[in-house]
Amino acid sequence: MTFMAKLLMLSLLLLGISACGLAQSCIPLEVQPFDYTLDVHGTRYAGTAVVSPVPGEPVYELTAEGYTGVREDAERIYALLGHAGEAMEEKHINREYTHSYIIGTKYVHFSPACLLYGADLEKLDQFNRAGAWISGLHDTYTDVYRGYQLPWREIPLIAQTDFGARVEETFAILDSMGIAFGEPEAVAYWDVFAMQSEYDRSQFDQEPHTFEEADAILEIQMPTYLNGMRLKAAGMGTSDASLNDCRTSIRVRMTQQQIMEIDAGDCRFKAPQQQRGGEPIPPEQALAQYEQYLNQMLVLEEGTTEITSILLEYDVWLRYTAGVFSPTYHFYPVWSIYTTRSCDQPAMMIHALDGTEVIW
């Protein structure tokens, strides 16, 4: 082999190594289907993770015991609404939180919790007709928060509603519990039914969006969130944990991996992505970390003064289910209230539907 040929081979080898380092595609992420179990405070989640082919982003469907699946649930809803037999197209409006199924021009948004926890399906059609109201509220607040990050008192739509009064009410609750979170930097409205941030924006400007209208819709939805709900809390930030009633959906930032998404009902497991020069974390290890993270997060120690939204909501829910207090209002996390110190520490998220004084 001539000197020039050897030099060419060496150049190609170095080029290949460089490309591998840049693209990080030389470390294959190949995970076979596997059985999984998660034990969280006495509740056992079990099933099988199967590969779902998503180019460039390995995603695994976690099948849960006793759950029929989202598509089967959608077909039952279609039959209920008189659309049995029509062509069904699946569309993920927000892949982490929502499944939107479309029949023709008719939108039907729902949560699998409706069927899993026995909500009144006959009211879904009513929700479908009125859904633009709450969706509009959600879009407005999240757009303002993400786009401008204004202090909540400076957001025009808040000034036109009783939103500010309800925020002040929340701080009164926190103060009575001896918990100080500081002044919120900004506020985001969460659609408690399905996180529909991209829901049919053509309807957004066609309907009036008031809290009275949103409350009327939420009165329909509340049975979904009060039947069988163990915990419902949400946080926004770089380190994010969101526990939902039917789908224990956790997004955690860990060492050597990007945000991992795991569900325990309508389940997908997003395989951990490798970091620069790092080995991908095996799913079994990620699940073990997730299980440990869950158990640590949900433990509320006596005398805790720095309480995150997860711990606070869990404490409130335990008191509610244990009959320690019987409020005359419905509560659920609908506002995300952030302190000036950190956007990762949301305060209590609560809302009185009937306008009664919120005290326990």
Name each model-derived stretch.
Residues 20-240:
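Preferential activation on post-signal-peptide N-terminal prodomains/segments
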Residues 48-71, 271-288, 343-347:
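Short, exposed beta-strand "edge-strand" segments with a Pro/Gly-rich flavor and a Y/T-containing core
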Residues 169-174, 178-331, 336-339:
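Segments that shape or occlude catalytic/ligand-binding pockets
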